[in-house]
Amino acid sequence: MGNNVVVLGTQWGDEGKGKIVDLLTERAKYVVRYQGGHNAGHTLVINGEKTVLHLIPSGILRDNVTSIIGNGVVLSPAALMKEMKELEDRGIPVRERLLLSEACPLILDYHVALDVAREKARGAKAIGTTGRGIGPAYEDKVARRGLRVGDLFDKATFAEKLKEVLEYHNFQLVNFYKVEAVDYQKVLDDVMAIADVLTSMVVDVSDLLDQARKRGDFIMFEGAQGTLLDIDHGTYPYVTSSNTTAGGVATGSGIGPRYVDYVLGIIKAYSTRVGAGPFPTELFDDIGEFLCKKGNEFGATTGRRRRTGWLDAVAVRRAVQINSLSGFCLTKLDVLDGLEEVKICVAYRMPDGREVTTTPMAADDWEGIEPIYETMPGWSESTFGVKERSGLPQAALNYIKRIEEVTGVPIDIISTGPDRTETMILRDPFDA
């Protein structure tokens, strides 16, 4: 039996992690975010009511769950307070259910200003960030000049540190990017107004998780974005600024790596990507448009239209390697309903004619890749809301089986709709 389960994306994000975390937290005591920031967009549908979470873990809707934001997360105080208010207005007692690590780096106004200015300066070469200050906040962390939640306990020292770091960043903004400086007093006043709320939720996350583990409590670690956006293993530089892979769980929460029992990879039945970067199976035809519209492929955070394409098993196999996946959860199978045929990319043809079954590491090496497909019959029957494997069309079952064969990983959960009830749990990760 596995007490500690990781849920992460195996593609370029937007795989449907939030719903699955919410579903599985029925048995969890703790849900932990360990990387990313409010650039994530996790959509939950419960009894027809939609909730979109960006920063707060998806376990927050459960009264039996304590939600934790770990040290690997860059935390925007403004975004957190906005999200807390939205939930509290619906009667959810967020402050009773949410805890923070004091080591979370803070995202402040100057990080957002830098993010936006840089993307604008890149012009046609823009990475396609969410413009929410994520990258600049991680830069400050690595440069050891970042402000953290724990700094708010000493407000006078915080003010001094803020003045120093803001002078540094305003020099860049004014002299290099030719934009207005960020006002020191406004940033300070905004943070001080909510400092006590933030510090009241601070705990020693590593110790809390270790004590929970020793008691045998079930813990779930909720990933954001996807494996192929990992800062080290993704399609660099078209990546996010954190480790979205299983390795980020230990460093981003403080739990020991040996205590992770099961890693669940969320895999969409087709591929999507937001922003710039390599995407070998991208479709520019009517099928691509069909997938976008039927799958409602618009970002929960930015509203941007997602690029769509066939399932890329080559890219997913890289995610299997990096994350040592225990099993898959297949999502959005119902979006493929009605297609005469479905395709899986099983290899790449490189510009020099070679066939390869692993992904390149550098973004430039993806140029000119041609996907090699296996084509399978589609199905006309609806899979939407089907809750038993026996209720799926044979062609859909064949597609599922082939995914398992080409990736070497079993599909333990199948999602056939946005509601938590529209799910088949073939093997519960907490029982694996």
Curated annotation (Swiss-Prot):
It is found in: Cytoplasm. Pathway: Purine metabolism; AMP biosynthesis via de novo pathway; AMP from IMP: step 1/2. GO terms for biological process: 'de novo' AMP biosynthetic process; IMP metabolic process. GO terms for molecular function: adenylosuccinate synthase activity; GTP binding; magnesium ion binding. Binds 1 Mg(2+) ion per subunit. It is an enzyme of class 6 (ligase). InterPro entries: Adenylosuccin_syn_GTP-bd, Adenylosuccin_syn_Lys_AS, Adenylosuccinate_synth_dom1, Adenylosuccinate_synth_dom2, Adenylosuccinate_synth_dom3, Adenylosuccinate_synthetase, P-loop_NTPase. GTP binds at residues 13-19, 41-43, 306, 332-334, 415-417. IMP binds at residues 14-17, 39-42, 130, 144, 225, 240, 304. GO terms for cellular component: cytoplasm. Keywords: Cytoplasm, GTP-binding, Ligase, Magnesium, Metal-binding, Nucleotide-binding, Purine biosynthesis. The active site is at 14 (proton acceptor), 42 (proton donor). Its EC number is 6.3.4.4. SMART domains: Adenylsucc_synt (SM00788). Mg(2+) binds at residues 14, 41. Substrate binds at residues 300-306. It catalyses: IMP + L-aspartate + GTP = N(6)-(1,2-dicarboxyethyl)-AMP + GDP + phosphate + 2 H(+). It holds the Pfam family Adenylsucc_synt. SUPFAM superfamilies: P-loop containing nucleoside triphosphate hydrolases. Homodimer. This is Adenylosuccinate synthetase.
